Amino acid sequence: NFTKGSGSSVYIADIDKYTDSQVFPGHVWDGFVDDGNGVNHIDVKNCNIFNFGSGAIVINGTDVHLDNNHIKNIGGTALYLRGGDLETLTPSNNEILNNNIHHVGYLQKSYVPAIGMHGVGIYVAYNDLYDAPHCIFNYHGNDHVIEYNKIHDAVKECLDMDAIYTRNEYVPQWRGSVIKNNYIYNIGIYPVGEYKKQLNVSAIRTDNYGHALQIYNNVFA
């Protein structure tokens, strides 16, 4: 129920809105990508997505649900999801739930998170996210919720970075996001012979005057 676009990418416009229990072995480009015009009512669930040299899933749209997928061995960002209207604050109703995402950014190394988000009202919960040289989350926009995720073994090869990262000094209207009830551990530790601790690493950072956020009930270990 899908067709392949150029470079063997799977274009969202060709998926018939729903992909369930498929296996997508990788190649050098992105995995799922939208057609550039935005899409809506997309479900990708119960899929195994692995060995992509760039991103695994790149979608700009609304009512997008990425649920219970196993994504691994990704050269860049595993999931990049955009959606919602930043002018009217209309939420995207996009969700990223119950995914196992690991071993990301093995080629590009920095600013290629497990999950990148931009827009309004993206909900991310109950994911197991780990093994990244840089950040796990890099998000921008309004009214996102990041909760009940297990985040570990990240920022292994870089300094001055964090497991969950945002910055909004140039766009102070980006506000209202909530980060709560996450379990975050083994950040900035990379085993090279003896364990090495990276410098200036945190679990959560709101960089350069990041503000108007709620951060509570997270566990750090």
Where are these regions (language model features)?
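Right-handed parallel beta-helix
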Residues: N1-K4, P25, N37-S54, D63-G76, ...
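Extracellular beta-strand/beta-solenoid scaffold signature
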Residues: G5-D35, N51-V58, I74-E87, L107-G116, ...
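Conserved SAM-binding loop
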Residues: N138
